[in-house]
């Protein structure tokens, strides 16, 4: 595990402990379960939205709402989650990914709420999930999907977090970086397998990470290529290899109009 990931996970454990003191688990769980029957907050079907785009012959784009990153700093000083979400929805995104990590990515729970309220797209809570509390918390905020990072979790906890998410009606995007992590990810139920092209130790990106894992991917999984998609050529390279699902953040966040950049990149 990289030093930065270890540092982030230590902070996450502290955040969960502090959150439990502010609002206990039974309260968060009750709110999460109540949202299953709320017409505006019930889960929107993240995996289904991805499948529908691909079935129609289109790229399924998870468009990211991200103010900053540890490696690049602030990406978008004029950061308005609702406006960004509407722009993505108008230009063909399948789903949204909203950063909720505060310390490292300058995210916030309110950004997820604002983005989801501004459109009808399903929303991923993009964060480092290490505890069941965060899964219930995500659903209580309205999240339709959570991210599980294989490098950050042991197998038992990862399967427990997935089971909780599925029970609440959410989907799960499991993220891998190499073949060993992929073997572990394929033991989960989720069809959504994200391949992060960024090396967690060097922060360098190469699309060969995704391409190299394709031969090990079962046909019933949707491969989501993450990080390093910056040009139309990158998109064409992936689609030529039958990779039709993408998670893109930086390229959109640096553009004047994120949605228009989505349309240009995936034209």
Curated annotation (Swiss-Prot):
Keyword Ribosomal protein belongs to the record: no
GO biological process, one term: L-tryptophan biosynthetic process
Class of the enzyme per the UniProt entry, highest EC level: lyase
A GO term for molecular function: phosphoribosylanthranilate isomerase activity
E.C. code: 4.1.1.48
Known catalytic reactions: 1-(2-carboxyphenylamino)-1-deoxy-D-ribulose 5-phosphate + H(+) = (1S,2R)-1-C-(indol-3-yl)glycerol 3-phosphate + CO2 + H2O
Key word Amino-acid biosynthesis present: yes
Pathway: Amino-acid biosynthesis; L-tryptophan biosynthesis; L-tryptophan from chorismate: step 4/5
Domain of life assignment: Bacteria
Keywords: Amino-acid biosynthesis, Aromatic amino acid biosynthesis, Decarboxylase, Lyase, Tryptophan biosynthesis
Family: Belongs to the TrpC family.
Name of the protein this chain belongs to: Indole-3-glycerol phosphate synthase
Gene name tied to this protein: trpC
């Amino acid at each position: 595990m990289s030093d930065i990931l270890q540092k982030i996970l230590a902070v996450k454990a502290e955040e969960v402990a502090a959150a439990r003191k502010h609002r206990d688990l039974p309260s968060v769980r009750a709110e999460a379960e109540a949202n299953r029957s709320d017409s505006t907050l019930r889960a929107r079907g993240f995996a289904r939205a991805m499948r529908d785009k691909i079935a129609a012959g289109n790229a399924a784009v998870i468009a990211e709402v991200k103010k900053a990153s540890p490696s690049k700093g602030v990406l978008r000083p004029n950061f308005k989650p609702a406006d960004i979400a509407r722009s993505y929805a108008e230009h063909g995104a399948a789903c949204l990914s909203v950063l909720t990590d505060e310390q490292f990515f300058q995210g916030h729970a309110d950004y997820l709420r604002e983005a989801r309220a501004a459109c009808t797209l399903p929303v991923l809570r993009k964060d480092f999930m290490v505890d069941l509390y965060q899964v219930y918390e995500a659903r209580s905020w309205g999240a339709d999907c959570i991210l599980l990072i294989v490098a950050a979790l042991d197998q038992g906890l990862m399967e427990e977090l997935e089971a909780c998410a599925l029970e609440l009606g959410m989907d799960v995007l499991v993220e891998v970086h190499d073949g060993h992590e992929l073997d572990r990810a394929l033991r989960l139920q989720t069809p959504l397998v994200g391949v992060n092209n960024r090396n967690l130790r060097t922060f360098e990106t190469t699309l060969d990470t995704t391409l190299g894992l394709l031969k090990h991917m079962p046909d019933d999984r949707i491969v989501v290529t993450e990080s390093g998609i910056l040009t139309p050529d990158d998109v064409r390279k992936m689609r030529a290899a039958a990779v039709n699902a993408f998670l893109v953040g930086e390229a959109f966040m640096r553009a004047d109009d994120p949605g228009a950049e989505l349309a240009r990149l995936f034209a």
